[in-house]
Amino acid sequence: MLTIYNTLSKTKEVFKPLDGNKVRMYVCGMTVYDYCHLGHGRSMVAFDLVTRWLRKSGYELTYVRNITDIDDKIINRANENGETFDALTARMIDAMHEDERRLNILPPDQEPRATDHIAGMHAMIQTLIDKGYAYAPGNGDVYYRVGKFVGYGKLSRKKIEDLRIGARIEVDEAKQDPLDFVLWKGVKPGEPSWESPWGPGRPGWHIECSVMSTRCLGESFDIHGGGSDLEFPHHENEIAQSEAATGKQYANAWMHCGMIRINGEKMSKSLNNFFTIRDVLEKYHPEVVRYLLVASHYRSAINYSEDSLRDAKGALERFYHALRGLPRVAAKGGEAFVERFSVAMNDDFGTPEACAVLFDLVREINRLRDSDPEAAAGLAGRLRELGDVLGVLQLEADDFLRAGAEGKVDAAEVEGLIQARLQARADKNWAESDRIRDQLTAMGVVLEDSKGTTTWRLAD
């Protein structure tokens, strides 16, 4: 029985899809004006994990994650670069997909782009105007009337009165209330625009997600996800728009993943601790980065540091050492481990406990390796099966353990030296065997002898 922490109710709830076994999930995706940073990677990996477990559990999932391809940041960056906004977004979308591929993130079933849904935005905005939830002051803009929506603040638990008192908002004469937010922005010089009933312009950010989600999944759906930084105002405003327009509950459950902290501090460009996924992958194996992102519970903040990455690398090395030398066979045995893993994942996707199960499984594989290699191989298959839920442990063990050797050592030379050492050992020429080992050690190569064979990896 799967339980999910619902930000809307602030409690864990038993998950019950709206339509039998079918699950519809929408996640706020990238605003594609720059390369993906680690925070984006955290959200992508978190909901990839949710996707994998829902499907592993037998649900028929439709996963939609949008692309915001028109926005102030996009326009500003395109102008800085001297390129069109669509040239910039096309380039950044390609880069995003490459980052996802390297992190073993499954593509969503649908990936709608805001600029493909302008007509739908016009329709929803007009509905809101007709119902009195929005107004056009005549300057080309259209605003949402926050005070009219009775449920405003139900996601974030913020009260309109408190927001007004604490608001530090520039006075906008066109707004009836400082808290009102824009649905449609009138055209400005040098900006892309689309025709609309209120004059040329472009959509506000919040209306984009309301329209794309409901167009792809229907007026009500099961799960809406995103980073915790989107809870207010973005997700709060989505609820206000969508429920005012349709008269129905928008999303049944709201899931929010935690933020990335860098050495204990918030990641930001001003603190000079801002890392793109590409920056990190230049230094660390993609699977190490992914494991760092899945080993913590999705709602927790992750502290990114050299130590945390070394810990992630060490964990994966333990897993792959257990797999090394065992044939790839179908998963067999270890039902108790599967049950514990399932209990952990069904408790709001409890990956820390699930990872602990993998470590226990590794200990059992190592215990059986010599005494019952067939059973050990079956459990190794089980380790890969459970690892696949986390998006890890699908590589050949040697490939992972030797990752990074390219450009540092000549693999053919290493293999040649290993064969020469094996021959020296067969000839009982221990001095030559030790000399070759010392030579390999000086090259940064660690040898591991087992039953007449020798494998190798690079030293940390």
Curated annotation (Swiss-Prot):
The keyword ATP-binding applies. A motif ('KMSKS' region) lies at residues 266-270. GO terms for biological process: cysteinyl-tRNA aminoacylation. One of its GO terms (cellular component) is cytosol. It is an enzyme of class 6 (ligase). A motif ('HIGH' region) lies at residues 30-40. Binds 1 zinc ion per subunit. It is found in: Cytoplasm. Zn(2+) binds at C28, C209, H234, E238. InterPro entries: Cys-tRNA-ligase (IPR015803), Cys-tRNA-synt_Ia_DALR (IPR015273), Cys-tRNA/MSH_ligase (IPR024909), CysS_C (IPR056411), Rossmann-like_a/b/a_fold (IPR014729), tRNA-synt_1_cat_dom (IPR032678), tRNAsynth_Ia_anticodon-bd (IPR009080). One of its GO terms (molecular function) is ATP binding. Its cofactor is Zn(2+). Keywords: Aminoacyl-tRNA synthetase, ATP-binding, Cytoplasm, Ligase, Metal-binding, Nucleotide-binding, Protein biosynthesis, Zinc. ATP binds at K269. Its EC number is 6.1.1.16. It catalyses: tRNA(Cys) + L-cysteine + ATP = L-cysteinyl-tRNA(Cys) + AMP + diphosphate. Monomer. Belongs to the class-I aminoacyl-tRNA synthetase family. NCBIfam families: cysS. This is Cysteine--tRNA ligase. It comes from Pseudomonas putida (strain ATCC 700007 / DSM 6899 / JCM 31910 / BCRC 17059 / LMG 24140 / F1). The gene is cysS.
